[in-house]
């Protein structure tokens, strides 16, 4: 227990003072809108709209200096001049200033790590693109997975308390608490489906930063406790990607020394099931080679961990235990599972013949066709049954522009789902988009689809129908013709377009 406390104290020792005066500096709000400065500290947000000016900031600072405007009661909160007419505008400016200021301590730590002044403790963090090869290399060797939905209904006070571990400037934290309590409907700010107000859309950077800091606090403690429970240190998040057969070698080592009595106590720790942890946004998975009982213990541990350490109700139904050979895992826009392929080998020794049945595990990724059709139906490309319809809103565009837009959507979907094991399910999506494009053009020219295609021919859709196989062939024209067969296998692209939207099936078609 003392070692855990020392670890937490070490992590929280890098605290920074005197952030409160920065709130009243005009240049802070200018920097918050300067994309060049934001890019230098790796915190660029392309969703910014530059609407602040020195005049607005001066008025804001003047009103913030008047402390009587911060005395708000439930009866006169709507009549307070500070939050009255320009409430959304002021909240946007304050939120951007807060987001910029509270990111300063984290940016300093990040820059110092990049310059080699400090050992990076978050060495297990990886880009989202590393998740796909990690799943492909490791999931075929695993048995069970915990599908976890991280709680998002976090109380504002818990978020402020989490931030206090890193920033001990009481004045700025009090002002932040006041700002959050005045505005915050936390469920609508974190959950994108409910974020319909202009305030929620404009101030997501601050609230997402607070929520991510809360999740980071949970993960840092969880990973530390996990590493203390085994002799295999820090094996999560794909650190050992280049050592795919590492655990097979360990099992081989166990078989070699199994007859040695002195190794019995140590071998129990070595043979402990390996745990892999991956998180993307609000969803995380914990996979292992262990048994169902072993995963149930981890499920109980997660529930207790969230409830006692973070004072947050965490219902057990938010954690699902799935066996990879029987269930599919929905993650990052794919349905992932482990398929068992039976293989029969005939062996003959002299006059005796034997049939040996081998079960080969293979990582399988499928395209979730039903959610994709639902997204297309929501965007009015088809109905709920998947029958294509025209897009009246695009009938005013030129023919080439209409084809380019439909083709871009089709190529993005094909590009993202190129890692699928079975690409035949994408043909239906291409059919919906192709026929929807044809019906939109026919409606524009007041003709039928058949007559329109017969008059113009099918060549005008060649760019629209270009598949990933053709893209590979055009990219590597000097390579052998056998390269076309590469398309039949799984391909993970590292330049995925609109990965966040496609991973959540919320693409803005």
Curated annotation (Swiss-Prot):
Cellular compartment(s): Plastid, Chloroplast
Chief place of localization: plastid
Gene Ontology BP annotations: mRNA processing; RNA splicing; tRNA processing
Domain of life: Eukaryota
Stored PANTHER family: MATURASE K
Protein task: Usually encoded in the trnK tRNA gene intron. Probably assists in splicing its own and other chloroplast group II introns.
Protein's name in the database: Maturase K
Originating organism: Ibicella lutea
Annotated gene: matK
């Amino acid at each position: 227990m003392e070692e855990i406390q020392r670890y937490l104290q070490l992590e929280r020792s890098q605290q920074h003072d005197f952030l409160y005066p920065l709130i009243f500096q005009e240049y802070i709000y200018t920097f918050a809108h300067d994309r060049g400065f934001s890019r230098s500290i790796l915190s660029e947000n392309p969703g910014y709209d530059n609407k602040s000016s020195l005049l607005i900031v001066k008025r804001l600072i003047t009103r913030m200096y008047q402390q009587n405007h911060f005395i708000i009661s439930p009866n006169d909160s709507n009549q307070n001049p500070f939050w009255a007419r320009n409430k959304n505008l002021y909240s946007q400016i304050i939120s951007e200033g807060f987001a910029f200021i509270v990111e300063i301590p984290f940016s300093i730590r990040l820059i110092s790590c990049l310059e080699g002044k400090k050992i990076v403790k978050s060495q297990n963090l990886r880009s989202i693109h590393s998740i796909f090869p990690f799943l492909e290399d490791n999931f075929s060797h695993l048995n069970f997975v915990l599908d976890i939905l991280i709680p998002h209904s976090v109380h504002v006070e818990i978020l402020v308390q989490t931030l206090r571990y890193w920033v001990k400037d009481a004045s700025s934290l009090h002002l932040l608490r006041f700002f959050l309590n005045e505005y915050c409907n936390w469920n609508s700010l974190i959950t994108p489906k409910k974020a319909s107000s202009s305030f929620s859309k404009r101030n997501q950077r601050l609230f997402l930063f607070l929520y991510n800091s809360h999740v980071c606090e949970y993960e840092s403690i969880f990973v530390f406790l996990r590493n203390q429970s085994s002799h295999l240190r820090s094996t999560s998040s794909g650190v050992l990607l280049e050592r795919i057969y590492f655990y097979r070698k360990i099992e081989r080592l166990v078989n070699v020394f199994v007859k040695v009595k002195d190794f019995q106590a140590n071998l129990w720790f070595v043979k402990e099931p390996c745990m892999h942890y991956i998180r993307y946004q609000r969803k995380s998975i914990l996979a292992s080679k262990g048994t169902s009982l072993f995963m149930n213990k981890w499920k109980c541990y997660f529930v207790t961990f969230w409830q006692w350490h973070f004072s947050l109700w965490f219902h057990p139904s938010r954690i699902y235990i799935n066996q990879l050979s029987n269930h599919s895992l929905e993650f990052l826009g794919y349905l992932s599972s482990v398929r068992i392929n039976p293989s029969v080998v005939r062996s003959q020794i002299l006059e005796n013949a034997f049939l040996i049945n081998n079960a080969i595990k293979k990582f399988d990724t499928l395209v979730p066709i039903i959610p994709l059709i639902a997204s297309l139906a929501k965007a009015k490309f088809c109905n709920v049954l998947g029958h294509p319809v025209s897009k009246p809103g695009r009938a005013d565009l030129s023919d080439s522009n209409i084809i380019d837009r439909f083709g871009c959507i089709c190529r993005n979907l094909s590009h993202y789902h190129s890692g699928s094991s079975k690409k035949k399910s994408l043909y239906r999506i291409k059919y919906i988009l192709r026929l929807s494009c044809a019906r939109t053009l026919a409606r524009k020219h007041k003709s039928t689809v058949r007559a329109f295609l017969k008059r113009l021919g099918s060549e005008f859709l060649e760019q629209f129908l270009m598949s990933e196989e053709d893209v590979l062939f055009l990219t590597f024209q000097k390579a052998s013709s056998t390269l076309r067969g590469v398309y039949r296998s799984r391909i993970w692209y590292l330049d995925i377009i609109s990965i966040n939207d496609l991973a959540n099936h919320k693409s803005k078609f």
